[in-house]
Each structure stands twice: as structure tokens, then as C-alpha cells.
């Protein structure tokens, strides 16, 4: 059996990590060991925060809808309940956009929801 020299494989692996670490400060972008640790940490944080972003935006939308609904004299929870009764299927993102960009349309939606039985 012939001997396999791993120089090329190791170099490629290290270059890949150092390429991912480009832009990091100090030794985190120069030395393989610290760069590897930082890349692993960065990828772990990115994975976690892709999921967290969805939660954060949902919280933001709910806060905006609640603020706009209270200006119309209704709480967020009452508004969502009334929207379900009125069979209005507007998601939270769209409601928040309406509340911010078109308050008149949002108040119409609230009025329609308030009259629902």
C-alpha cells in the first residue's frame, strides 16, 4: 500500500477556515487555531440567530399592532379575537405594515373587526 501524504488536504482545510475568518480582528483572522474557534462560534451564533430573528420580528409586529390598536381604543388580544370572528385573515406582518404605513386603512380594519359578532 502506498503512503498518503496529507499536505494538500491539510492546507486546503486550513485555507477554507482562514477564508471564512476573513474580516475578523487580530489573530482571529491570521492564526488557524484561533480562527477555527472563532469561525465555529460565528457559525453557531448565525444558526441560532436565524431562528431568533423570526421570534424577534414577530414580537416587533405584535408591539406595533398593539400600539396602533390601543390608539383605536382596543387591545391587541381583543383585536386578534375580533379579527378571527370577522373572518379577516390578515397576518401579523401585514397588520403591522398597515399600522405603520397606512393608519387610515388600519383603523378601517379595526372598525370592521369591532362590529363583528
Swiss-Prot record:
UniProt-listed GO biological process terms: ribosomal large subunit assembly; translation
InterPro entries found in the cross-reference section: Ribosomal_bL20, RIBOSOMAL_L20_CS, Ribosomal_protein_bL20_C
One Gene Ontology molecular-function label: rRNA binding
A Pfam family reported for this protein in Swiss-Prot or TrEMBL: Ribosomal_L20
Entry annotated with the keyword Metal-binding: no
Keywords: Ribonucleoprotein, Ribosomal protein, RNA-binding, rRNA-binding
Keyword Ribosomal protein: yes
Similarity field: Belongs to the bacterial ribosomal protein bL20 family.
Function: Binds directly to 23S ribosomal RNA and is necessary for the in vitro assembly process of the 50S ribosomal subunit. It is not involved in the protein synthesizing functions of that subunit.
The name this protein goes by in its record: Large ribosomal subunit protein bL20
